[in-house]
Amino acid sequence: MMTLLSTAAAQTTENPFFQNYNTPHQTIPFHLIKNEHYLPAFQEGIRQQEQEVEAIINNPQSPTFKNTIEALEYSGMLLEKVGAPFFNLLSAETNDELQEIAQQVSPLLTEHSNSIFLNDKLFKKVKIVYDKREKLKLNTEQKRLLEKTYESFVNNGANLSDADKETFRQLTKELNLLTLQYGQNVLKETNQYNLLIRDKNLLAGLPEDALKTLAENAEKAGKEGWLLDLKVTHYVPVMKYADNRDLRRELYLAYSSRCMKGGEYDNREIIRKIVNTRLKIAQLLGYQTYADYVLTRRMAEKTENVYHLLDQLLEAYRPEALREYEDIQHFADENNAYFKVQAWDWAYYSEKLKAEKFAVSDELLRPYFQLENVKKGVFGLAERLYGIRFIKNPKIPVYHPEVEAYEVTDRNGKFLAVLYTDFHPRDGKRAGAWMSEFKGQWKEGKKDSRPQIVIVMNFTRPTESKPALLTFDEVTTFLHEFGHSLHGMLSDCTYPSLSGTNVYRDFVELPSQIMENWASQKEFLDQFAFHYQTGEKIPVELIQKIKDAENFNVGYSCLRQLGFGYLDMAWHTLSSPFEGDVVDFEKQTVAKTQILPYVENTAISPTFNHIFSGGYAAGYYSYKWAEVLDADAFSVFEKNGIFDQATAQSFMENILKKGGTEHPMILYKRFRGHEPSIDALLRRNGIISTNN
């Protein structure tokens, strides 16, 4: 184990975190940062914020918004300076040493957070300001910050007795270590599996691009043949295209049984501990369940409202999902399947039926979605809607050679942000796609600190003979994460904790999901979707097929997401400690959303990173919640034109720039004119008539 370094050792001129960055826009000098720099910087950051908090407490003047709430808000800048790159790299470019540091840092940060929120003297000052809030002449953003600060203290145990505060400290420390261990187990077990195929015939049906990727994967490992693993870009093509049913089954079982086979990475006991620790924390704070605790800071507000949404959607989409299963089974029978369609058959026969029904497939579309062109198209969309431009700057340091950095400006050339793009999978990068911040946006005095944003993907790599070509789903993913980045880059707020994506979890997906709507719009695709070999613009007929296919298997897709939502809520609406079997509990919970036969010894929970290590506990429903919002919001663009400047300006001013400065329903109604309903989503998905 690494030993904790002394603060004295931290105070060296060699540690970049203690210097002003001599880089464009004071971006992070990744080339100078070494793993040994993190721990001393964390320790010094903690020490500095402790001093800042002490200064607030010892201020002899009466507590005011400025000397207490604002002073606390702007404290801890060094801690943020080191924490943002560290935790981003822990997901995007991790290694054993970083993970070891994380194990040491996590309890330090938890204890530090507790030392602030459980500080009686500090809370007393915060409460004095809060109690006289009606008499203070605060603007909207100041009121929001005051309310959020006070609620943060209360929700982090400030009103507890001394004994309960100590219990709270221990529980939060345990919880942070458990969630960290859970995520690391998922990554390690995912990376551990591989299957070498030496006979190409066993991979019949796979597109040439996928075969080349798997061959290159084997070559990197010093092996001959085709190396399969559980990374999404390798796993999905096998499930979609491999004619070999036994191979699909083997890979499916490996993927769906991760972290539940009794080995060192088994997460089932960790799940019990996480769920029970969260319950203890919630009940210590006076809530019946952890979901009750979480939802006080969400648009949904109550568990009943979450279940109302999930139940509404289940009732609307389940009949469609059952029809889809019948269609897939009938199609498989017509193709001499002679078996009941199982989980490892679904993607394979779905892809074939989709290709036959709509004459469109991923492989037909890929040639038109060269990554470089898609990137230009997405950037161009932002320029057309919001007047922002992207200029690549190779002088900005990056954390991996594949990462690119862009300066973002408004139409007048004013600097807005730095955007990093990280597109391809590699060892040390977790699966999925996400947006994050290396630095948030905030103002202090005349200084407007502009954000540094990163979007991370796992798109299929280029091969020796072809550039990186995206699937339509990957184009949609790009737009999704880019929508999050717009929320960060266009932020125009005063306080860091209210800026950018610092909004309620069930609101944060609106800016991302609304961007997905442009993916199938002809006027958008015409700007960039050119065949990578011939330069031919994507044909009108193909665009129409994309639109026709948009609602293919929409019922199944919705039920799958609802299953995740119900499972999340089930784990977090428990009102007594869970001592049962994780897999059985899950099986009973998601049964009403399942249309495929149950597969023994598989489960979602052991690798459900979103809720057990990713911040979506009692919050996975927010994807469907935001889908309702985005369908309702995009209907304004559909009515006025998808590039309509007035609509785009309103969305930017009322949503993208505002961060969490007001309650999200107020912001949404200011843009839309009314509260959202599910009707626009049901119409978009063809569940109800467009005339309704």
For the regions a language model picked out, list residue spans one by one.
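Active-site-proximal, well-structured secondary-structure segments within enzyme catalytic domains
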Residues: 145, 177, 184, 188-229, ...
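Short, hydrophobic/amphipathic alpha-helical patches that form generic packing surfaces
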Residues: 77-88, 147, 151, 253, ...
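N-terminal helix-rich structural modules
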Residues: 12-207, 212-213, 637
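Short pre-active-site segment immediately N-terminal to the catalytic Zn-binding motif
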Residues: 460-479
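Short His/Asp/Glu-rich catalytic/ion-coordination signatures at enzyme active sites or charged loops
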Residues: 22-37, 86-105, 128-170, 229-269, ...
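Bacterial Sec-dependent N-terminal signal peptides
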Residues: 1-13
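C-terminal, non-catalytic "cap/extension" segments appended to globular domains
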Residues: 12-37, 44, 204, 225-227, ...
